[in-house]
């Protein structure tokens, strides 16, 4: 199960969003990280059994986004 993001300027998986940010195809300041996190938490709450591998992947991607924001 892949978590997909739905934003005004992007729709797709989180790893693709990160790829576009790293290639400067999307501006990290245009990405509402708080909204992405809130939406993901809502999805996790709906899952009957949390797949920790998926949650771990999200945490890695979200952390990488935050680090990218700090280093810009």
Predicted regions and their residues:
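Glycine/small-residue-rich interface belts in oligomeric ring/scaffold proteins
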Residues: 28-67
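Conserved small/polar residues in nucleotide/adenosyl-binding loops
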Residues: 70-72
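Conserved interaction-surface patches within small, structured recognition/assembly domains
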Residues: 1-9, 24, 29-32
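Peptidyl-prolyl cis-trans isomerase
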Residues: 14
